[in-house]
Amino acid sequence: MIPSLWISKTGLDAQQINMNIISNNLANVSTNGFKRSRAVFEDLMYQTIREAGTNSSLETTLPSGLQLGTGVRPVSTERIHTQGNLSKTDASKDVAINGSGFFQVQLPDGNIAYTRDGSFQLDQNGQLVTNSGFPIIPEINIPSNSTNINIARDGVISVVVQGQTQPVLLGQLNLINFVNNSGLESLGENLYQETQASGSPIETTPGLNGTGVLYQGYVETSNVNVAEELVNMIQTQRAYEINSKSISTSDQMLQKLSQL
């Protein structure tokens, strides 16, 4: 069997995965707080025919060896946690993070998840929740007779209640940072989960220790650049076509051999 057939096959598999990732990025171009991904690849093991530095004669050595590669494989998908644009909504419950950090979210199983999507809502009890209904940590309850909600840059939440002139302090929204954001596991629903690779969560007041600040009435949009993804798609398509051509050429060579 001609090795180039299998080598090209690994190239096809790799480019298909790359296309899947690009398609997912483009599909989430309108998803609040979405962070685009990129595929990371590495070459497979090599077959060493001649080692560099071995003797070519009694007095000379080979300056370079002869190694034949066996293809490529995907290693990981890396999240690119760059800042997305802030889109003005004027909704009092919308909060965007300008800078680093994540909001904390309580999951039904008791675990904690993290999100950049600050398009919050109120449930039937007046509690601040995500669009999927998951409560924000710490628990924030907005009184039903509130006339104005204020979320400061440092995360302090206060409201003005009917019949009163002084604002009532409700709580503090802190942000969570990680040593390695790319190590977070994506759960869907704009949520991430801590892993061993991400490191432990570090809770910080917005605006302190390099953490981002909060902007009320804004949401962070996806950081997907459509033009860049389309260029990546064209490159991936061309790479797929080239690997397909390699398979066709190898097949033609094999046919020639079988006719001898």
From Swiss-Prot:
Claim: Endoplasmic reticulum is one of the keywords in the record: no
One Pfam family from the UniProt entry? LlgE_F_G_D1
Q: Which UniProt keywords apply?
A: Bacterial flagellum
Keyword Nucleotide-binding among UniProt keywords:
no
Annotated GO biological processes are: bacterial-type flagellum-dependent swarming motility
Q: Which NCBIfam families match?
A: FlgEFG_subfam, flgG_G_neg
Q: What is this protein called?
A: Flagellar basal-body rod protein FlgG
